[in-house]
């Protein structure tokens, strides 16, 4: 990449489209050292390891086989599937089968929230 391309990349990266992360100095997270907290779904269990600082929450979540969420979620997320298979259902009836390497990005949406379920189990990385 030439100097002009680098400058253009950084200019575009720093304009309004970038996520605004505040009050979080550089920090490395060893997820294996984060406290594991279990959350019961309508059926099954999910296991969360959570980094919650500044204005963001970052989670490594494992949905155990047979998990079905106990609520519709209207909070915005970026979710990346690392392992397994997770189904995201929108209240409008659409379903999306998420496999390793796929992600979804969604804004806060009271009108069309989502929920998650899995037959096989899944491990995901979530930022919200």
Predicted regions and their residues:
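Short beta-strand segments in beta-sandwich/barrel cores
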Residues: 68-69, 85-89, 103
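Ligand-binding loop in jelly-roll beta-barrel domains
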Residues: 108-128
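A short, N-terminal "cap"/entry segment at the start of jelly-roll beta-barrel domains
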Residues: 2, 7-59
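Conserved short histidine dyad/triad with adjacent acidic residue
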Residues: 57-73, 108-109
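Short acidic-glycine-tyrosine-enriched beta hairpin
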Residues: 92-109
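Short, conserved beta-strand element in jelly-roll/cupin
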Residues: 73-88
């Amino acid at each position: 990449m030439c100097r002009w391309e680098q400058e253009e990349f950084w200019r575009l990266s720093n304009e309004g489209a970038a996520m605004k992360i505040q009050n979080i100095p550089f920090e490395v997270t060893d997820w294996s050292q984060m406290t594991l907290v279990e959350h019961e779904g309508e059926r099954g269990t999910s296991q969360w390891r959570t980094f919650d600082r500044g204005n963001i929450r970052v989670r490594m979540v494992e949905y155990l086989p047979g998990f079905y969420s106990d609520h519709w979620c209207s909070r915005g997320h970026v979710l990346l599937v690392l392992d397994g298979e997770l189904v995201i259902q929108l209240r409008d009836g659409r379903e999306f089968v998420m496999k390793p390497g796929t992600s979804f990005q969604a804004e806060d949406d009271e009108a069309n929230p989502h929920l998650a379920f899995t037959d096989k189990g899944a491990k995901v990385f979530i930022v919200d």
